[in-house]
Swiss-Prot record:
It is a multi-pass membrane protein. It comes from Saccharomyces cerevisiae (strain ATCC 204508 / S288c). The lineage of its organism: Eukaryota, Fungi, Dikarya, Ascomycota, Saccharomycotina. May be involved in specific transport of UDP-Gal from the cytosol to the Golgi lumen. Involved in the maintenance of optimal conditions for the folding of secretory pathway proteins in the endoplasmic reticulum. Overexpression confers resistance to the immunosuppressive drug, leflunomide. Glycans are attached at residue 165. GO terms for biological process: UDP-galactose transmembrane transport; UDP-glucose transmembrane transport. Residues 1-4, 64-106, 158-174, 236-245, 304-307 are lumenal. This is UDP-galactose transporter homolog 1. The gene is HUT1. Keywords: Endoplasmic reticulum, Glycoprotein, Membrane, Sugar transport, Transmembrane, Transmembrane helix, Transport. The keyword Transferase does not apply. Coiled coil: none annotated. It comes from the Eukaryota.
């Protein structure tokens, strides 16, 4: 790791710059009513398709830059089942989360997306039967408590407390259901991805079959494209037509869409590079801070009103996740000394 400080700084700045911009572009892209079409660009699968296309091209450049010895075509042939599952859960999670914005506010969406630890733990517990430490359970409870406080403490939370029979509450519950489904798929994605990487490292005896972050970035985005095309053909062809109509009537949406996709693709490069060079602990520290700054920027730039209870909820969530990261660091210190 000697002499890697500058690389770490570049990675952190890259993740901050790309994903803070990504988050700021995402909100107007998903919630703004465009003047000519008089509609919102709420076409999650179209957004997913465009973003995956840009990310796949970026992943291809990333592969060439790394000069990997394991051809992506052979990697797909060897691991197509895992890639299909991961890409399916990944491609389904994003549209569900985006659709939830029709029913919940953006800050609730952002905070919920910061709680990926809980579904990951649940998937490991229920699907892979992985023992979960008590500390992880406490952190999961803290995160859940923080989300509850944040939601109830907001203006929308007042409506929930008045009556569960109001018409708006059905939409609110539907939004939470979409967010819950998205988080579960995120957990399934991450857990299956971890299983694939660990199994590959255990069997790998040379660089000829080593799976890198660049491999996953390219192949997973390729499969995401295929899944979305299949969705348009079989389930919802009108979504594509409606999206094209909005883009034709309001061409300025293209600017937001391409900037959103480009920032997401660049962010994936920095994330995978950080994961390979510095490990998951450093990546967790950077991404947790990034999510917190994203919400604060959303408050400042878009004038969101946040009550005291919501701030308490935020600090509980990020405090719990940070505590988890610090505990991982302490657990890794003895391993580093014995190495």
């Amino acid at each position: 790791m000697a002499g890697s400080t500058s690389s770490l700084v570049i990675c952190a700045i890259g993740i901050y710059a790309t994903f803070l911009t990504w988050a700021l572009v995402q909100e107007p892209l998903a919630t703004r009513t465009w003047p000519n079409s008089m509609g919102k660009f709420q076409f999650p699968n179209v957004i997913s398709l465009i973003q995956a296309s840009v990310a796949m091209m970026m992943g291809y450049l990333y592969l060439n830059w790394k000069k990997v010895e394991y051809p992506p075509r052979k990697m797909i042939k060897d691991h197509w089942k895992q890639l299909m599952l991961i890409s399916f859960t990944q491609s389904s999670s994003g549209p569900l989360a985006t659709t939830s914005l029709k029913h919940v506010d953006y800050l609730t969406y952002m905070l919920a997306k910061s709680c990926k630890m809980i579904p990951v733990l649940l998937v490991h517990l229920l699907l892979y039967r992985t023992p979960i430490a008590s500390q992880k359970k406490v952190v999961a409870l803290l995160v859940s408590l923080g989300v509850t406080i944040f939601t109830i403490g907001g203006n929308d939370g007042k409506k929930l407390k008045r009556s569960f029979n109001e018409s708006g509450n059905d939409n609110k519950l539907q939004g939470f259901g979409l967010l819950f489904s998205s988080l579960f798929l995120d957990g399934l994605t991450n857990a299956t991805q971890d299983k694939l990487l660990k199994a590959n490292k255990a069997k790998e005896k040379g660089k000829q079959t080593l799976i890198t972050g660049a491999h996953l970035m390219f192949t997973l985005n390729l499969f995401v494209i295929l899944w979305n095309i299949l969705y348009f053909i079989v389930i919802d062809c009108k979504q594509w037509d409606n999206a094209v109509s909005v883009l034709t009537m309001d061409p300025q949406v293209w600017g937001y869409l391409m900037l959103y996709s480009f920032c997401g693709a660049m962010g994936q490069c920095f994330i995978f590079y950080t994961l390979e060079q510095f490990g998951s602990l450093v990546l967790i520290m950077i991404t947790v801070t990034r999510k917190m700054v994203s919400m604060i920027l959303s408050i400042i730039v878009f004038g969101k009103s946040v009550r005291f209870q919501q701030w308490v909820g935020m600090f509980i969530v990020f405090g719990g996740i940070t505590w988890e990261a610090l505990n991982k660091k302490k657990a890794n210190i003895p391993k580093a000394k014995s190495a």
